[in-house]
């Protein structure tokens, strides 16, 4: 599996990074698919930026990218993290490892990703397009489905 998680050079989830990685994967004779880690280096190690990362991924999916096959998220019931300690001192539902999005934010992110996949599927079905191995970029998701509202990058 190939997982883009960002690194010393910064994030690698944007369209140009995904396209380059997919070209390298295809050039190596491997199936054209990868996952993106919305946390770690791609969020600048700030769990609150995961929705920004996933909004970019949703836009890529909604406009036709079929090589994105998965997204990794840091999620728990409550936002943030806490230091490990005696059970009586811990907040139930909050991470003791990496900082996480809360469940409400996670639900919104997953809803946006679901809408992006539906937009892509609806467009492909409406055009009766045979899905090629490396599809051309499609129209804007809002042009295809005006009801789709992706989270803003702010």
Model-derived features with residue positions:
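Ala/Thr-enriched low-complexity intrinsically disordered regions
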Residues: 129, 133-134, 142-143, 153
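Serine/threonine-rich low-complexity intrinsically disordered regions
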Residues: 42, 151-152
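Expand to "…catalyze enediolate/carbanion chemistry for C-C bond making/breaking, isomerization
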Residues: 1-131
């Amino acid at each position: 599996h190939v997982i883009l998680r960002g690194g010393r050079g910064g994030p690698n989830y944007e369209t140009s990074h995904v396209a380059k990685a997919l070209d390298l994967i295809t050039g190596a004779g491997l199936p054209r698919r990868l996952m993106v880690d919305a946390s770690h280096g791609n969020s600048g190690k700030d769990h609150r930026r995961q929705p920004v990362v996933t909004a970019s991924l949703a836009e890529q999916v909604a406009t036709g990218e079929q090589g994105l096959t998965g997204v990794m998220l840091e999620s728990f019931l409550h936002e943030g993290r806490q230091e490990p300690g005696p059970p009586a001192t811990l907040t139930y539902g909050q991470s003791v490892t990496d900082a996480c999005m809360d469940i409400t934010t996670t639900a919104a992110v997953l809803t946006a990703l679901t809408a992006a996949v539906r937009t892509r599927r609806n467009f492909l079905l409406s055009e009766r397009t045979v899905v090629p191995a490396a599809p051309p970029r499609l129209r804007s998701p809002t042009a295809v489905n005006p009801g789709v509202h992706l989270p803003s990058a702010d």
